[in-house]
Design a protein with these regions (language model features):
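N-terminal leader/targeting and accessory segments in enzymes
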Residues: 1-97
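Walker A (P-loop) phosphate-binding motif
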Residues: 99-113
Length: 113
């Protein structure tokens, strides 16, 4: 299933920087797991051990153009001219909210094990 970037923006309550059209199929939180950069949305998560924001440059070079961030890069317009940055207070909360909204679209029982 694909989501338009506009739909993602509305679902997570983000402020969008960038005007490139995008369809999102894959959500990414670990830059080592990148498979389909053209349709990937990267969530720059901050943890005790790392900060996903430091992988934006590498992912951009590898073809990712859509990022959910807690802070936009200072050199955003110069170094990432074809990127879309979705600015939120917490990328983790945005990921959780998107997962919740996606789940709400289906009327399928959830089974926990």
């Amino acid at each position: 299933m694909y989501y338009s970037l506009e739909k993602v923006v509305s679902l997570i309550g983000a402020r969008r920087f960038g005007n490139s059209e995008a369809k999102i199929k894959w959500l990414l939180t670990d830059s080592r797991s990148l498979a389909f950069p053209e349709t990937t949305l990267f969530f720059a998560l901050r943890t005790r051990r790392g900060d996903g924001h430091k992988y934006i440059n590498d992912l951009y070079r590898r073809g990712v153009r859509n990022f959910v961030v807690g802070k936009c890069p200072d050199d955003m317009e110069q170094n990432y001219p074809h990127a879309n940055f979705l600015l939120v207070v917490s990328p983790l909360k945005a990921l959780q909210r998107l997962a919740e909204r996606h789940r709400d679209e289906y009327n399928i029982p959830v089974i926990g094990v």
